[in-house]
């Protein structure tokens, strides 16, 4: 779910094209690769799955907390870039141990089947994540617009009075449209920020469960 809403953030807030939105995710991919290699060779042999998976989830939770700091004034370098790097590091820690644990002890003839099941589970989990984020973001954005509608209306009336423009005049319509667009932008970013905070808490809970109960 994080990737989808980060893409929306890049395109809707920054005005990036689909191509540029894909390019700005490259630091995440590089961080994933740079972390996965030492994770498989050094971290997993030392900590085992019991230690590496909670560590990776904690790093992912940290990336969501970074994303949750986004505001209408945030730049790509201020929030998105560091968040993407940390997110890639978290994926680099969790992916090797997840697939290794999922196929460990499986007969060689059934390794392909086990990998397919893991991939399917990953896709299903991603779908649930998207559904959860969508539900939260939609409701949060609607609530934000409702709570701030009167404030925006008052700001529009004040701006039209200063500009000596009527609501139906071209200048008045431009003022209204500008303030409405700003309200929608703020509502979306507030929704995304809250959604990332929620996901960080969910992952923190998962880390706590893994640490307390242990994993195989």
Show which residues each predicted segment covers.
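Transmembrane core module of solute transporters
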Residues: 1-113, 216
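Hydrophobic transmembrane architecture of multi-pass small-molecule transporters
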Residues: 99-101, 105, 117-215
